[in-house]
Amino acid sequence: MGEVIWNKETYNELIVNLKNNADEKYRDFTLNLNPGKEKIIGIRIPELRKKATEISKGDWRKFLDISYKNDNGYIEEEFIRGLVIGNVKNCDIEEFIDYVDDFIGRIDSWSVNDTFCSSLKITKKNMDRMHTFILDNLKSKNPWRKRFSIVMLMDYYLSEEYLDEIFDICDTIKDDEYYYKMAVAWLLSMCFVKFRDRTMAYFTSCNLDDFTYNKALQKTRESLRVSKEDKEILKEMKRKTVKM
């Protein structure tokens, strides 16, 4: 089979193919995980990843252009676009960042965001440039850009070199959006797993709001890589909040 020539017709054929392979149970599962997302076909991520890998070997730029212009609103379309970008090999880092920047400006789902972040393996070969890009997005008023940055820090920068910076970011970059706060809590739970003593010290003197702080402790306690003793200590560290 030759390379697909992407146009409105071939893109619609892709959507029909996805619908023909829909899993209703998985669709219901995905609906529950993504409040506000009604248009879901029901395709598992490994299958979407296979599609994206095939597309990225061809004219992926044309595919992205056509897919944006002919978007049907399905979450699977967002997943595929993100995974295609994550798979590209034949572009320089600045062009890559342009595509990433455009994509994250359209994100409105935590699952799309987090799957996208995990696919950006090119980050490992461009740590400094991507680090700058991540910090730039933390300045945005868009909470999804901030979540992108937090998850990227967790996926690629969770090391001794960046730990103090991560703590500082969690203390100083604020946003009332639920999915941003939950990303910060998740990041800090992973910090605890890798750097127990320094993260414990951070928890005792941090500047987190009560919700994010308590969620960070909760997510840390839920980890299978945290000892029973530490879970008890963390339980006692929970802040008591007054319900209004």
Which residues fall in each region the model found?
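Alpha-helical scaffold domains
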Residues: 1-244
